[in-house]
């Protein structure tokens, strides 16, 4: 009977490590990397947008709800997801 009780305790406690205090699934690096790759496929990640930066003549925005109306300041930039920092622009050089 002791083995059965121990097995039940382990089965009840083990799933708790996959959730944080708020009941949300804990996000690991591999999930955010997958999201970043998803955002950068095809034309999902960028589009031409209205420029809202004074003195700038160019910008790109994310097409996803998560990025909203964010514009990158230079050409060649793409919207990427940085784990724990959220979405932002990734610009060459």
Swiss-Prot record:
Modified positions (4-hydroxyproline) in chain numbering: 54
4-carboxyglutamate carried by residues: 48
GO cellular component, one term: host cell postsynaptic membrane
GO terms for MF: acetylcholine receptor inhibitor activity; ion channel regulator activity; toxin activity
Signal peptide (UniProt feature, chain positions): 1-23
Localization of this protein: Secreted
Highest rank taxon of the organism: Eukaryota
Expressing tissues: Expressed by the venom duct.
Propeptide residue range(s): 24-45
Cysteine pairings via disulfide bonds: 62-71, 67-79, 72-89, 77-91
Keywords annotated in UniProt: Acetylcholine receptor inhibiting toxin, Disulfide bond, Gamma-carboxyglutamic acid, Hydroxylation, Ion channel impairing toxin, Neurotoxin, Postsynaptic neurotoxin, Secreted, Signal, Toxin
The keyword Disulfide bond appears for this protein: yes
UniProt key word Magnesium: no
Domain statement: The cysteine framework is XX (C-CC-C-CC-C-C-C-C). Displays a mini-granulin fold, a structure composed of two short, stacked beta-hairpins connected by two parallel disulfide bonds. This newly described fold is derived from the same cysteine connectivity as knottins (ICK fold). The name 'mini-granulin fold' comes from the structural homology with the N-terminal region of the human granulin.
Role this protein plays: Alpha-conotoxins act on postsynaptic membranes, they bind to the nicotinic acetylcholine receptors (nAChR) and thus inhibit them. Through its two C-terminal domains, this homodimeric protein would bind to two nAChR allosteric sites, located outside the nAChR C-loop of the principal binding face and at the adjacent binding interface in a clockwise direction. This toxin specifically blocks mammalian neuronal nAChR of the alpha-7/CHRNA7, alpha-3-beta-2/CHRNA3-CHRNB2 and alpha-4-beta-2/CHRNA4-CHRNB2 subtypes.
Quaternary structure (record): Hetero-, homo- or pseudo-homodimer (identical sequence, different post-translational modifications). Heterodimer of [carboxyGlu-48, hydroxyPro-54]Ms20.1 and [carboxy'Glu-50', hydroxy'Pro-56']Ms20.4 may exist.
Family assignment from sequence similarity: Belongs to the conotoxin D superfamily.
Protein name according to UniProt: Alpha-conotoxin-like Ms20.1
Organism: Conus mustelinus
């Amino acid at each position: 009977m002791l083995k059965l009780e121990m097995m039940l305790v382990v089965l009840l406690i083990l799933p708790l490590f996959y959730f944080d205090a708020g009941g949300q699934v804990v996000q690991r690096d591999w999930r955010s990397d997958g999201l970043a790759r998803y955002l950068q496929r095809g034309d999902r990640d960028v589009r031409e947008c209205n420029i809202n930066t004074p003195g700038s003549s160019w910008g790109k925005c994310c097409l996803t709800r998560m990025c909203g109306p964010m514009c990158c300041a230079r050409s060649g930039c793409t919207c990427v997801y940085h784990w724990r920092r959220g979405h932002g622009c990734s610009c060459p050089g």
